[in-house]
Amino acid sequence: VLCLVLVCVVAAAVALGLVSRRVKSFAGGASFSLDYQITSTAAEEPALYKVLAQFGGTSGRVDGQYTPEALQLELYPQASGSSQPLTRLYISKDETLYDAGQLYHTLRSSITDNYPLAGVLIPEWNMGSYISQTQLASLLGVDDTATSLQSMNDFQLDLKKIKKVQPENAKAGYLYFRLETDDTAADSPVLTLGVEKSGLLRAASPAVHILLDIPAHGIHTELTGTVTPAAPTLTAPTSRMQDSDIASLVQLRQTVESVVQFVQGAAS
């Protein structure tokens, strides 16, 4: 029995040592490609979830890069099968920016692909590409906190603050750890990182299983894929919408809706 206990202790120490080295390699930055599935946990679908659902973006692939200062994401919905992202996000400790120009381009292309003549009626995008969380909140008629994702940058890859856990939907052969933040609020985000045990021994990118809950936004996200240690240089987008563009964007959205109704009626 004593030998068995010693073996277990040694195995646990080795595993934690491997995790320690792996976490340190990710602390400076990483790149990743992950399949994702987002579900709503709120009684009423949250604003951001509704936007994604309208474009079939609640499941698909997310490619991105991470540094301790910022996070950059590209979303590729499973339903579209397009080589172009639905939208891009830039998340720093100070703000969340959404690529509204890319989202509009995706919408316009999906319409003109089915109704080529609609391209004459639907104008091209002629504003700054990125919309801020405050501008998006104003457009959606919600509070600023509903469009802010800065909490995604609060998770700390600090070995002293990482707790070993075993989630209900754990995958076989994975070690799971909960990353903590300094936010003690009841609705603070919770991130559980699962790393394939065999991947801890490899120099290449390990397979991961990530569970992310953001109670403040009423969403749960499950991600699977690979993460690679990297040292990317992320800079905030310079092509940004002005506050005065919001009225133009509202008018543009109304134009698109009117054109879609017209071409669908003409085609029926």
Give the residues covered by each predicted segment.
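Subset-of-secretome marker
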Residues: 2-268
